Swiss-Prot record:
Specifically methylates the N4 position of cytidine in position 1402 (C1402) of 16S rRNA. Gene3D superfamilies: Putative methyltransferase TM0872, insert domain, Vaccinia Virus protein VP39. This is Ribosomal RNA small subunit methyltransferase H. PANTHER family: 12S RRNA N4-METHYLCYTIDINE METHYLTRANSFERASE, S-ADENOSYL-METHYLTRANSFERASE MRAW. HAMAP family: 16SrRNA_methyltr_H.
């Protein structure tokens, strides 16, 4: 995810690339999954460091189209897959791969998507209020124009961690009585009229609302949970997982997932009964999240908020996915609220 100010870098620079390669340790003959292909930065580096193969997944058809040149450059070693990384287990197995050697995920919206006003992700450029990464399903405009006030407030509070979510939702509902909201700057200006920017504020008043709508429209947190579970199923013993997250919402999910699967979860408190002993499906590569160096942050501002968590697969069976244990909270559903 780009930094909260939406100061995207162009061309796209893969964050913590050297650290990711050090985690994955690509080897000749290996098969690796880049679940968030984007501009192909991680994929290119993996293919360039060993005579291996990469299965690159992206739900954005424009990313797949741009990736064709890279597939030509690394003929026979790069397979481009249009789809969601949350479905990686099915997508990879359909290609005949039972297991893989490594998985890398770079979570959130890409700087390229922010730079394209017509995609509707940016509150700094005027464009259609869309925000769909893959172009399918209801758009952000559908959400702001059809969800009731309580549902909008819940989405903005949970996914944007916006303290004034109720006031923002109230303003949206009032504004659409006169005219529906269909442009990004319309919504950004409306939110700014509710959340007045203070001189010391580092982020735009609409940052959290736009983040919440984007996460909701694309089911980003559900996608992340399913992707982590899919990686757990696909990685063979010794296979490695590297996840780069830019926001606390995503990083908390990754942390909880790996904490549970490395055997560090323990009891929630001393009054809870002991859990049955379960063999850890991952072992830690680093106890804490890794952060970008000061030198990298100077070159690439996106790296400022990046956290890399990594683990190595054990021989133990994969554990069932438990969304509640990952901290998921109840929110409206796209289908239910738009029906």
């Amino acid at each position: 995810m780009s930094d909260n100010g939406q100061n995207s870098a162009s061309p796209h620079i893969p964050v913590m690339l050297a650290d990711v390669l050090d985690v994955l340790k690509p080897r000749d003959g290996g098969v690796y999954v880049d679940g968030t292909f984007g501009a192909g930065g991680y994929t290119r580096a993996i293919l360039g460091s060993a005579d291996c193969a990469v299965l690159a997944i992206d739900r954005d058809p424009t990313a797949i189209l741009r990736g064709r040149a890279l597939a030509t450059e690394f003929a026979g070693r790069l397979t481009l897959i249009e789809g969601r990384f949350g479905d990686m287990k099915r997508l990879v197995r359909e290609l005949g791969h039972g297991t893989v050697d490594g998985v890398v995920l770079d979570i959130g919206v890409s700087s390229m998507q922010l730079d394209q006003a017509e995609r509707g992700f940016s509150f700094q450029q005027d464009g259609p209020l869309d925000m769909r990464m893959g172009g399918e399903g209801p758009s952000a405009a559908d959400v702001v124009n059809h969800f009731d006030e309580a549902d909008l407030a819940r989405i903005i509070a949970v996914y944007g961690e916006e303290k004034r979510a109720r006031a923002v939702a109230r303003a949206i509902v009032a504004a659409r009585q006169t005219a529906e909201l269909h442009r990004t700057l319309e919504l950004a200006d409306l939110v700014a009229s509710v959340i007045h920017r203070k001189p010391q504020d580092r982020i735009h008043p609409a940052t959290r609302t736009f983040q919440a709508l984007r996460i909701f429209v694309n089911d980003e947190l559900g996608e992340l949970a399913r992707g982590l579970s899919g990686a757990e199923d696909l990685l063979h013993e010794g296979g490695r997982l590297a996840v780069v997250a830019f926001h606390s919402l995503e990083d908390r999910i990754v942390k909880r997932f790996l904490t549970a699967r490395t055997g560090r979860a323990g009891r929630a408190n001393r009054y809870m009964p002991e859990r049955d002993e379960v063999a850890p499906s991952f072992r830690e590569i680093a106890h804490k999240a890794m952060k970008a160096s000061e030198e990298e942050v100077e070159i690439n501002v996106r790296a400022r908020s990046a956290k890399l968590r990594a683990a190595e697969r054990t021989a133990a069976p994969a554990l069932p996915l438990d969304l509640a244990a990952l901290g998921f909270r109840a929110v409206p559903t796209l289908d239910g609220s738009l029906a």
